[in-house]
Amino acid sequence: LVECPECGASHRADHLVEDATDVEDAEALPGEEVAELIADNDIACPACGTPLAGEPVEAFNLMFATDIGPGDAQPGYLRPETAQGIFVEFPRLKEYARGNLPFGITQIGPAYRNEISPRGGLLRLREFTQAELEQFIDPEEDEPPLDRVRDVEVRLYPATEQEADDGDYLTTTVGEAVDEGVIGSPWVGYYLGVAQEWYERVGVDTDRFRFRQHLAGERAHYAADCWDAESEVDGDWIEIAGFAYRGDYDLSKHDEYGDDAF
Protein backbone atom coordinates (compact mmCIF):
# COMPACT_ATOMS: atom_id res chain seq x y z
CA LEU A 1 0.00 0.00 0.00
CA VAL A 2 1.23 3.49 -0.87
CA GLU A 3 -0.73 6.66 -0.14
CA CYS A 4 -0.57 9.90 -2.08
CA PRO A 5 0.61 12.77 0.15
CA GLU A 6 -1.46 15.27 -1.85
CA CYS A 7 -4.90 13.75 -2.46
CA GLY A 8 -4.77 10.85 0.03
CA ALA A 9 -5.61 8.18 -2.56
CA SER A 10 -4.40 4.68 -1.72
CA HIS A 11 -2.85 2.43 -4.35
CA ARG A 12 -1.33 -1.03 -4.55
CA ALA A 13 2.32 -0.14 -4.94
CA ASP A 14 3.18 -3.40 -6.70
CA HIS A 15 0.56 -2.74 -9.38
CA LEU A 16 1.91 0.77 -9.99
CA VAL A 17 5.39 -0.67 -10.48
CA GLU A 18 4.15 -3.39 -12.84
CA ASP A 19 2.24 -0.85 -14.93
CA ALA A 20 5.22 1.50 -15.24
CA THR A 21 8.10 -0.98 -15.64
CA ASP A 22 8.99 -4.37 -17.07
CA VAL A 23 8.74 -5.97 -13.61
CA GLU A 24 6.07 -8.70 -13.77
CA ASP A 25 5.88 -9.86 -10.16
CA ALA A 26 6.38 -6.83 -7.94
CA GLU A 27 4.17 -8.48 -5.32
CA ALA A 28 7.05 -10.83 -4.56
CA LEU A 29 9.44 -7.98 -3.75
CA PRO A 30 10.06 -6.50 -0.29
CA GLY A 31 8.38 -3.18 0.36
CA GLU A 32 11.72 -1.37 0.39
CA GLU A 33 12.51 -2.54 -3.14
CA VAL A 34 9.06 -1.53 -4.38
CA ALA A 35 9.58 1.94 -2.87
CA GLU A 36 12.95 2.19 -4.65
CA LEU A 37 11.35 1.23 -7.97
CA ILE A 38 8.69 3.90 -7.47
CA ALA A 39 11.40 6.51 -6.89
CA ASP A 40 13.73 5.32 -9.67
CA ASN A 41 10.93 5.33 -12.25
CA ASP A 42 9.32 8.63 -11.20
CA ILE A 43 5.97 6.94 -10.60
CA ALA A 44 3.20 9.36 -9.74
CA CYS A 45 -0.26 9.08 -8.19
CA PRO A 46 -2.72 7.99 -10.91
CA ALA A 47 -5.43 10.14 -9.33
CA CYS A 48 -3.69 13.54 -9.17
CA GLY A 49 -0.21 13.14 -10.67
CA THR A 50 1.75 13.85 -7.49
CA PRO A 51 5.14 12.05 -7.42
CA LEU A 52 5.17 9.14 -4.96
CA ALA A 53 8.95 9.00 -4.52
CA GLY A 54 9.87 8.86 -0.85
CA GLU A 55 6.44 7.70 0.31
CA PRO A 56 6.48 4.57 2.50
CA VAL A 57 5.21 1.27 1.11
CA GLU A 58 3.39 -0.64 3.84
CA ALA A 59 1.78 -4.05 4.16
CA PHE A 60 -2.03 -4.17 4.01
CA ASN A 61 -4.41 -6.85 5.32
CA LEU A 62 -6.69 -7.94 2.47
CA MET A 63 -9.14 -9.72 4.80
CA PHE A 64 -12.43 -7.99 5.62
CA ALA A 65 -12.86 -7.66 9.39
CA THR A 66 -16.31 -7.80 10.96
CA ASP A 67 -18.04 -8.41 14.30
CA ILE A 68 -19.96 -11.60 15.04
CA GLY A 69 -23.05 -11.36 17.22
CA PRO A 70 -24.53 -8.58 19.38
CA GLY A 71 -23.06 -6.86 22.42
CA ASP A 72 -19.46 -7.80 23.08
CA ALA A 73 -19.18 -9.35 19.67
CA GLN A 74 -16.35 -11.61 18.67
CA PRO A 75 -14.10 -10.41 15.86
CA GLY A 76 -14.40 -12.31 12.60
CA TYR A 77 -13.17 -12.17 9.03
CA LEU A 78 -14.81 -12.88 5.69
CA ARG A 79 -12.98 -15.71 4.00
CA PRO A 80 -10.35 -14.62 1.45
CA GLU A 81 -10.46 -18.09 -0.13
CA THR A 82 -12.94 -20.97 -0.11
CA ALA A 83 -10.42 -23.67 0.82
CA GLN A 84 -10.62 -23.40 4.60
CA GLY A 85 -14.19 -24.67 4.66
CA ILE A 86 -12.93 -27.96 3.25
CA PHE A 87 -10.05 -28.20 5.72
CA VAL A 88 -12.27 -27.50 8.73
CA GLU A 89 -14.58 -30.34 7.68
CA PHE A 90 -11.72 -32.77 6.93
CA PRO A 91 -12.52 -35.24 9.79
CA ARG A 92 -16.11 -35.58 8.52
CA LEU A 93 -15.03 -35.73 4.88
CA LYS A 94 -12.55 -38.49 5.65
CA GLU A 95 -15.36 -40.51 7.25
CA TYR A 96 -17.43 -39.96 4.12
CA ALA A 97 -14.51 -41.34 2.09
CA ARG A 98 -14.42 -44.36 4.47
CA GLY A 99 -11.00 -43.33 5.68
CA ASN A 100 -9.34 -44.07 2.35
CA LEU A 101 -6.84 -41.87 0.55
CA PRO A 102 -6.64 -40.36 -1.97
CA PHE A 103 -9.92 -38.50 -2.20
CA GLY A 104 -10.88 -35.12 -3.60
CA ILE A 105 -13.43 -32.48 -2.67
CA THR A 106 -14.72 -29.82 -5.05
CA GLN A 107 -16.69 -26.72 -4.19
CA ILE A 108 -17.73 -23.36 -5.56
CA GLY A 109 -18.64 -20.27 -3.59
CA PRO A 110 -17.98 -16.62 -2.76
CA ALA A 111 -14.73 -15.21 -1.40
CA TYR A 112 -13.87 -11.69 -0.27
CA ARG A 113 -10.72 -9.57 -0.42
CA ASN A 114 -10.42 -5.96 0.64
CA GLU A 115 -8.60 -4.88 -2.52
CA ILE A 116 -6.89 -1.51 -2.27
CA SER A 117 -7.68 -0.54 -5.84
CA PRO A 118 -10.16 -2.83 -7.63
CA ARG A 119 -9.66 -2.65 -11.37
CA GLY A 120 -9.53 -4.66 -14.56
CA GLY A 121 -13.28 -5.05 -15.09
CA LEU A 122 -14.22 -8.42 -13.58
CA LEU A 123 -10.62 -9.50 -12.91
CA ARG A 124 -10.08 -7.92 -9.50
CA LEU A 125 -13.12 -7.53 -7.28
CA ARG A 126 -13.77 -7.32 -3.56
CA GLU A 127 -16.38 -10.08 -3.84
CA PHE A 128 -15.93 -12.88 -6.34
CA THR A 129 -16.65 -16.56 -6.96
CA GLN A 130 -14.07 -19.33 -6.66
CA ALA A 131 -14.24 -22.92 -7.82
CA GLU A 132 -11.68 -25.38 -6.55
CA LEU A 133 -10.57 -28.94 -5.99
CA GLU A 134 -8.66 -30.06 -2.90
CA GLN A 135 -7.06 -33.47 -3.39
CA PHE A 136 -5.91 -35.29 -0.24
CA ILE A 137 -3.11 -37.82 -0.68
CA ASP A 138 -0.56 -39.86 1.21
CA PRO A 139 2.66 -38.58 -0.41
CA GLU A 140 4.51 -41.78 0.50
CA GLU A 141 1.88 -44.17 -0.83
CA ASP A 142 -0.28 -42.49 -3.48
CA GLU A 143 0.83 -41.79 -7.04
CA PRO A 144 -1.13 -39.92 -9.71
CA PRO A 145 -1.97 -41.49 -13.09
CA LEU A 146 0.87 -39.48 -14.60
CA ASP A 147 1.17 -41.68 -17.69
CA ARG A 148 -2.19 -40.33 -18.88
CA VAL A 149 -0.68 -36.85 -19.36
CA ARG A 150 3.03 -37.67 -19.57
CA ASP A 151 3.28 -36.63 -23.23
CA VAL A 152 1.18 -33.47 -22.91
CA GLU A 153 3.23 -30.46 -24.02
CA VAL A 154 3.27 -27.48 -21.66
CA ARG A 155 4.90 -24.07 -21.68
CA LEU A 156 6.45 -23.44 -18.28
CA TYR A 157 7.96 -20.33 -16.74
CA PRO A 158 9.92 -21.67 -13.75
CA ALA A 159 11.19 -19.41 -10.97
CA THR A 160 14.78 -20.02 -12.08
CA GLU A 161 14.02 -18.62 -15.53
CA GLN A 162 12.19 -15.61 -14.10
CA GLU A 163 15.21 -14.74 -11.97
CA ALA A 164 17.76 -15.22 -14.77
CA ASP A 165 18.85 -12.21 -16.83
CA ASP A 166 18.16 -14.08 -20.07
CA GLY A 167 15.36 -16.30 -18.75
CA ASP A 168 12.81 -17.71 -21.14
CA TYR A 169 9.94 -20.16 -21.31
CA LEU A 170 10.58 -23.87 -21.14
CA THR A 171 8.50 -25.85 -23.62
CA THR A 172 8.53 -29.49 -22.61
CA THR A 173 6.26 -32.38 -21.71
CA VAL A 174 4.71 -32.98 -18.32
CA GLY A 175 6.68 -36.22 -17.94
CA GLU A 176 10.02 -34.59 -18.70
CA ALA A 177 9.30 -31.66 -16.38
CA VAL A 178 8.52 -34.02 -13.49
CA ASP A 179 11.45 -36.35 -14.22
CA GLU A 180 13.90 -33.42 -14.36
CA GLY A 181 12.55 -31.81 -11.19
CA VAL A 182 11.24 -28.66 -12.88
CA ILE A 183 7.86 -29.58 -11.41
CA GLY A 184 8.62 -30.88 -7.94
CA SER A 185 5.45 -32.86 -7.28
CA PRO A 186 4.10 -35.48 -9.71
CA TRP A 187 0.62 -34.59 -8.47
CA VAL A 188 1.09 -30.96 -9.49
CA GLY A 189 2.48 -32.16 -12.82
CA TYR A 190 -0.55 -34.38 -13.36
CA TYR A 191 -3.01 -31.56 -12.79
CA LEU A 192 -1.04 -29.15 -14.98
CA GLY A 193 -1.34 -31.73 -17.76
CA VAL A 194 -5.07 -32.21 -17.19
CA ALA A 195 -5.56 -28.44 -17.16
CA GLN A 196 -3.53 -27.96 -20.35
CA GLU A 197 -5.75 -30.46 -22.17
CA TRP A 198 -8.89 -28.77 -20.88
CA TYR A 199 -7.79 -25.25 -21.82
CA GLU A 200 -6.98 -26.47 -25.33
CA ARG A 201 -10.42 -28.09 -25.63
CA VAL A 202 -12.25 -24.90 -24.66
CA GLY A 203 -10.27 -22.83 -27.15
CA VAL A 204 -7.65 -20.95 -25.11
CA ASP A 205 -4.93 -19.57 -27.41
CA THR A 206 -1.92 -21.67 -26.39
CA ASP A 207 0.45 -19.12 -27.95
CA ARG A 208 -0.65 -16.72 -25.20
CA PHE A 209 -0.84 -19.25 -22.38
CA ARG A 210 1.68 -20.44 -19.79
CA PHE A 211 2.16 -21.99 -16.38
CA ARG A 212 4.22 -19.65 -14.19
CA GLN A 213 5.86 -20.85 -10.98
CA HIS A 214 5.58 -18.56 -7.97
CA LEU A 215 8.80 -16.93 -6.85
CA ALA A 216 9.87 -17.65 -3.29
CA GLY A 217 8.90 -14.16 -2.17
CA GLU A 218 5.34 -14.36 -3.51
CA ARG A 219 4.58 -17.97 -2.63
CA ALA A 220 1.94 -18.27 0.07
CA HIS A 221 3.03 -19.40 3.51
CA TYR A 222 1.10 -22.66 3.17
CA ALA A 223 2.53 -23.69 -0.21
CA ALA A 224 5.57 -25.85 -0.79
CA ASP A 225 5.19 -25.07 -4.49
CA CYS A 226 2.68 -23.20 -6.62
CA TRP A 227 2.07 -22.65 -10.33
CA ASP A 228 -0.44 -20.30 -11.96
CA ALA A 229 -2.15 -20.87 -15.28
CA GLU A 230 -1.93 -17.49 -16.99
CA SER A 231 -3.31 -16.08 -20.23
CA GLU A 232 -2.07 -12.96 -21.97
CA VAL A 233 -4.85 -10.41 -22.40
CA ASP A 234 -4.12 -6.98 -23.90
CA GLY A 235 -0.45 -7.31 -23.04
CA ASP A 236 -1.00 -8.35 -19.41
CA TRP A 237 -0.66 -11.85 -18.01
CA ILE A 238 -3.85 -12.74 -16.13
CA GLU A 239 -4.04 -15.56 -13.59
CA ILE A 240 -6.93 -17.88 -14.38
CA ALA A 241 -6.13 -20.77 -12.01
CA GLY A 242 -3.66 -21.72 -9.30
CA PHE A 243 -2.10 -25.12 -8.59
CA ALA A 244 -0.64 -25.25 -5.08
CA TYR A 245 1.04 -28.12 -3.28
CA ARG A 246 -0.02 -27.23 0.26
CA GLY A 247 1.59 -30.20 2.02
CA ASP A 248 0.02 -30.75 5.43
CA TYR A 249 0.18 -27.12 6.50
CA ASP A 250 -3.57 -26.55 6.83
CA LEU A 251 -4.48 -29.86 8.45
CA SER A 252 -1.56 -29.75 10.88
CA LYS A 253 -2.54 -26.24 12.02
CA HIS A 254 -6.17 -27.22 12.54
CA ASP A 255 -4.97 -30.29 14.43
CA GLU A 256 -2.71 -28.15 16.61
CA TYR A 257 -5.20 -25.44 17.48
CA GLY A 258 -8.59 -27.15 17.06
CA ASP A 259 -10.48 -29.67 19.18
CA ASP A 260 -10.84 -32.37 16.53
CA ALA A 261 -8.17 -34.82 15.41
CA PHE A 262 -6.96 -34.06 11.90
Feature-to-residue mapping (PLM):
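TRNA-recognition modules of translation machinery and tRNA-sensing kinases, especially anticodon-binding
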Residues: 1-262
